[in-house]
């Protein structure tokens, strides 16, 4: 598996394969715990394996000094509203001890670049309203929230 260099020589990005399904599930559970929603994570390793092997979802991992410390789960979407494709980030997590080192910013910059390379016009994700530190992070990288709708 190819490791993609970043501006931090100790931090590399790599795409997951279906064989990484267990690690993806582990990170989804970490995210669920952080979001106080672990009981909502009902995915199984087999389900994640299927999503990855059928190219219905993708994952990038962030490895720091060879150890996985971050992940993003995403998939392609489209909008009749703008008549364009995009990328939707369904899960994003950086290990707590690795936050505030610029790694999340590197991961999101990679996602923006990937979207452009794939001809997508936007990258979207959700963020829980109570998660003020994440809201600050997203605003700091230039993201603009949509506060005129509720997702059901």
Q: Where are the language model's segments positioned?
A:
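Acetyl-CoA-dependent GNAT
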Residues: 11, 15-21, 26-84, 114
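Hydrophobic adenine-recognition pocket in adenosine-nucleotide-binding enzymes
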Residues: 16, 92-94, 127
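Short hydrophobic/aromatic beta-strand or adjacent loop that forms the aromatic wall/cage
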Residues: 57, 147-151
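Conserved acetyl-CoA binding element of GNAT-fold acetyltransferases
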Residues: 84-96
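Conserved acetyl-CoA-binding loop-helix of GNAT-fold acetyltransferases
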Residues: 94, 100-113, 140
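Conserved active-site alpha-helix within GNAT-family acetyltransferase domains
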Residues: 105, 129-148
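Conserved GNAT acetyl-CoA-binding A-motif
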Residues: 116-126
């Amino acid at each position: 598996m190819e490791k993609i260099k970043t501006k931090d020589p100790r931090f590399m990005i790599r795409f997951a394969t279906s064989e990484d399904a267990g690690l993806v599930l582990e990170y989804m559970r970490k995210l669920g715990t952080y979001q106080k929603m672990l009981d909502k994570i009902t995915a199984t390793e087999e389900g994640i394996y299927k999503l990855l092997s059928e190219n219905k979802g993708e994952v990038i991992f962030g490895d720091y000094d060879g150890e996985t410390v971050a992940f993003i789960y995403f998939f392609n979407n489209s909008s009749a509203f703008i008549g364009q494709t995009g990328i939707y980030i369904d899960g994003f997590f950086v290990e707590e001890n690795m936050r505030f080192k610029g790694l999340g910013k590197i991961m999101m910059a990679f996602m923006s670049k990937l979207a452009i390379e794939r001809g997508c016009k936007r990258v979207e994700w959700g963020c829980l309203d109570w998660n003020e530190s994440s809201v600050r992070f997203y605003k700091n990288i230039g993201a603009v929230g949509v506060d005129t709708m509720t997702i059901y």
